[in-house]
Design a protein with these regions (language model features):
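An N-terminal assembly and electron-transfer interface module characteristic of large anaerobic redox
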Residues: 1-181
């Protein structure tokens, strides 16, 4: 305006209109990273189970960690994803059309083999937990069946016992029966 006054509309200003300090927001991503880090690698009298930290295993790691440690296994997870890990397993990727998170899993299982775990556990899971919020609880086909692709394309998996059973966590009774087998 000619008199030097300013008019700001639509809250499009770079600076907030209020002079108050913003309150700290809860960062769910940081919380999840801290939670996963709290599950320390451990040893067990029945050997070690390596878990690749990709796709659905982030969400399910606390469950599987508890499951295997209660059964007497030590649990070890693969390192955090990065470009170096991707290149470690790149030579075993059969198709360039799969998503990048799936491609990373090749490096994760290679890292677990190199770490010397006794077993690598990566189940095929067509269904996930039923949270009662949707009509179905299907996993993406890549998430559900990628363990089969790894078994067929990562030669180093023959150096360890690779466990890729079919589990569905959506029906607890069936899970208990499958886990006994």
């Amino acid at each position: 305006f000619a008199n030097g006054a300013r008019y700001i509309a639509g809250n499009r200003c770079d600076k907030p209109l209020k002079k108050e300090s913003p309150t700290a927001q809860y960062n769910l991503y940081d919380y999840k990273k801290e939670l996963l880090a709290s599950y320390k690698p451990c040893t067990g009298p029945r050997g070690t189970i390596g878990i690749p930290m990709g796709l659905n295993m982030f969400e399910l790691y606390p469950f599987w960690y508890t499951f295997f440690t209660k059964l007497g296994f030590g649990v070890f997870h693969s390192p955090e994803s990065d470009r170096k890990l991707y290149f470690r397993g790149q030579h075993t990727i059969p198709s360039d059309t799969v998503c990048y998170p799936a491609k990373l899993l090749h490096g994760h299982v290679e890292a677990l083999v190199e770490a010397g775990v006794d077993n690598i556990f990566y189940p095929c899971m067509p269904y996930n937990f039923d949270e009662g919020k949707s009509d179905n609880n299907y996993n993406c086909p890549v998430v559900a069946y990628y363990p089969e692709l790894l078994a067929a394309n990562v030669p180093d998996l023959k150096k360890v016992r690779y466990l890729n059973p079919y589990f569905g966590l959506h029906r607890p009774r069936d899970f208990a029966k499958r886990a006994e087998a």
